[in-house]
């Protein structure tokens, strides 16, 4: 069976071996401890997770951030977003083809009393904005609950292996993004008036100002005085025929696979977009041992920092300005 895991990286340390057994369409596979289903499938060479309900075209991942549902599968009888759910020992994973059926559960569902939690401020999102807001509020003595749908805080900072530019005070210049995330998290956790709930999603805001959240499988009502929304970036794709096929990914999904989960989605890569995200993603690919066959930008010049572009040029990456993709 092919293994697409990155074992050697100039910045990141590869985690332990894949020892958690699971199956995909009846085929035995292994995942790393805590690895999400989508990354485990990619590491085992699976790129097609299902097929589009309209035309039957193959579907894989797009955002790998829990937003688009394109990577949905059936895991142990439940329809889940594969990029958000960790593999469990013995888990049976199948494609979500058509409508999911009802699970075979004995007896009626057991309901529990819903807990209501009060707080001064509820922050939705544990990325750089949410963490920074929590720090400033905590300094002022404000009670905060900070929630994030991932298992770890930091948002997109977790995916950034390069060193940041700017001033040291304003944006931690000279520090890698992933290390900035750890610094901000440590600072937030040092305040007793901040409660952190990971693997938690806000589901609804009711007319009485209560917020329904799903916290690690349990429903909780939060009654905040103020709601601060810091839900972060979303993938935006260039519109062209075939842009949802396996092999076409958002930059964030690519960085999630390569930099967070150390999984190589391909051996060769072409990047669309010469802004900072595209330029940096191309460099991340080179760090992971992926051949970047080119980068295109529709404008006359790349819009990202020249230092990022020059780095790619020095490493032999062809950059095509005034070019785009049509299909």
Model-derived regions: residue spans:
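Signature of N-terminal electron-transfer/Fe-S-associated modules in redox systems
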Residues: 1-117, 218
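Cysteine-centered iron-sulfur cluster-binding motifs in ferredoxin-type domains/subunits
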Residues: 30-35, 60-69, 123-132, 138, ...
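FAD-binding core/adjacent interface of flavoenzyme oxidoreductases
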Residues: 55-57, 75-122, 159, 180-268
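Aromatic/His-enriched, Gly/Pro-containing loop or helix-boundary segments
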Residues: 57-63, 172-181
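Rossmann-like dinucleotide/flavin-binding elements
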Residues: 109-149, 232-302
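Conserved N-terminal glycine-rich FAD pyrophosphate-binding loop of Rossmann-like flavoproteins
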Residues: 151-175, 235-247, 304-308, 315
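A Rossmann-like FAD-binding core segment of flavoenzymes
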Residues: 182-213, 222, 286-327
């Amino acid at each position: 069976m092919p293994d697409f895991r990155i074992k050697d990286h100039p910045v990141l340390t590869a985690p332990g071996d894949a020892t958690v057994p699971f199956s995909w369409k009846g085929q035995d596979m292994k995942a790393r401890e805590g690895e999400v289903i989508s990354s485990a499938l990619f590491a085992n060479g699976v790129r097609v997770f299902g097929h589009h309900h309209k035309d039957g075209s193959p579907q894989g991942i797009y955002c790998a951030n829990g937003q688009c549902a394109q990577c949905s599968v059936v895991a142990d009888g439940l329809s889940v977003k594969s990029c958000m759910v960790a593999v469990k020992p013995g888990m049976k994973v199948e494609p979500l083809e058509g409508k999911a059926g009802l699970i075979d559960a004995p007896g009626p569902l057991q309901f529990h009393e819903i807990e209501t939690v009060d707080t001064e401020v509820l922050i939705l999102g544990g990325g750089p904005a949410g963490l920074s807001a929590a720090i400033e509020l905590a300094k002022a003595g404000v009670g905060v609950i900070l929630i994030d749908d991932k298992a770890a805080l930091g948002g997109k900072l977790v995916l950034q292996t390069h060193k940041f530019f700017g001033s040291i005070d304003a944006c931690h210049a000279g520090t890698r993004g992933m290390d900035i995330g750890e610094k901000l998290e440590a600072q937030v956790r040092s305040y007793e008036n901040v409660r952190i709930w990971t693997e938690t999603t806000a589901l609804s805001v009711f007319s009485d100002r209560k917020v329904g959240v799903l916290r690690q499988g349990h429903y909780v009502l939060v009654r905040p005085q103020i709601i601060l929304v810091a839900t972060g970036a979303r993938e935006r794709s260039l519109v062209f025929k075939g842009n949802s096929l396996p092999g076409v990914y958002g930059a964030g999904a690519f960085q999630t696979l390569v930099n967070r989960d150390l999984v190589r989605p391909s051996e060769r890569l072409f990047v669309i977009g010469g802004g900072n995200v595209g330029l940096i993603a191309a460099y991340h690919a080179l760090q992971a041992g992926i051949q970047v066959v080119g980068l295109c930008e529709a404008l006359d010049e790349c819009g990202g920092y020249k230092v990022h572009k020059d780095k790619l040029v020095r490493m032999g990456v062809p950059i095509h300005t005034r070019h785009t993709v049509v299909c």
